[in-house]
Amino acid sequence: MSQSNNATTSQHRTAIPAGAGTLFFVQTFATLGFAVLYSTLVLYATKKLGFSEDNANAIMGVFGAFNYGLHMFGGYLGGRYLSNRNLFVLGMVLQVFGCALIAMEGVTGLYWGLAMFLTGSGLNVTCLNMMLTQRFAPDDDRRESAFLWNYAGMNLGFFIGFAVAGYFQLSENYRALFLFATLGNLAAIVVTLSRWSILADISTPLKEVSRSQWLRRLAVGIAILIVLVPVIRMLLTHAEFSSYFVVALGIVIFALMTVVTFRHRNAGERRRMKAYLLLALGSLVFWMLYQLAPMGLMLFSENNINLNVYGIRVAPQWIQNINTVVIVIGGPLMALWFNRLRQRGWNIDIPAQFSASLFCMGLGMLVLPLGIHLAGGDGLVAFKWIAISYVLQSIGELLISPIGYAMIGKLAPPRYQGVMMGCWMMVTGVASVLASYISGLMPQNAGSTPLLTNPGYSQVFNALGWGSVATGVVLLILIPLLRRMIHREPSVA
């Protein structure tokens, strides 16, 4: 009897739950289309459709903000109306049609295609993460490793998507590129449908309703999807208003979550929800700096970094692949490393990782003023400094992002898991808008030189770096408190 129990416990600790491996491949394929659009939208709009750079960048900003902002609603819609797996497949179908419309190479097709794509991608990311977190019990430590693997799969999708986008960009064959994006989306649908039964929802409000109620909710959910497309189409044409709207919505959602938390009756769950709110505030600082990559950091790389490396001209967009490589390689390695440290008695937990991530981000910013100080006579900064910065930022991302997703299952009561997962992802949407405001504080490069703009960049990077380090110190001080808030009392037999 004892041997049987030990075997069962050992299997529980080592075996991968059914569906977790499938979701790795689903994540990879689902990311392809987003990677293509994310990396090509501005170039496509300016080179093929004749948009001004300001117009194209404004659309890209709204694209990023609403992609993340819709994550919160995706958790609610999936958990209460459509089910996570149904909403995921419907979202991928919208992405297929969206990419096909964009491939028509017209302005009308672009706006409607983006609206359909955003509706799908914004809603289904939360569903994918919820399908994964529901494979594990709240106290199952394997959840963190599974999310690290899943996060590596997502970045593998980004790597492939960026590589293919660059290949077609050389010939500006955008039609073929966006049609390729539809193939990735279709592959994600096929894999999901092939493993449909093992990806069923667990412990969501929708599981508790009758068949007739489920059908009514399904109809309402589909109607919401249909209405969202023209609404997002309209908001894409009003980028400034949309940015303010995302920030205001984020503030309202955080305020509502605070009220819900303090009114929650279960003392243990209320304590863990408070820890969630504190960690969310800390993560906002990290993601605000992280989202500078396609904005202020991209312009700094293009204008102030020496991009001739060993005689090879490096495109600014390729620098993003430093992040992708670190995540793909580092994700599984960090999972193995953390498992070994825990076996040796190290307390590697959520508060410690969050604090460490902010230190990494701060150092990633602070190496740039050092590189600027050591710049050549022409003001160009050596490529190694931006590379080091991205490596440090990527390590910070590994510490906070997949662990942030995994912590929802640990801290959120079952009835709030979908909404809290969406709120967590909406933090990134708000951070994206705030990053655009910070980018506006950086020097303007038009008609200037690196020698003139370097002091301004150095000042901003110093402020951002020390701000991130200071936030990391605050979380470091709060680690004992956060650990007490997160701790679960042992159940009484």
What do these predicted ranges mean?
Residues 93-111, 356-378:
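C-terminal ends and interior cores of transmembrane alpha-helices
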Residues 80-92, 340-359:
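Cytoplasmic membrane-interface "Motif A"-like loop-to-helix N-cap segments
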Residues 123-137, 398-412:
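Intracellular juxtamembrane helix-capping segments at the cytosolic ends
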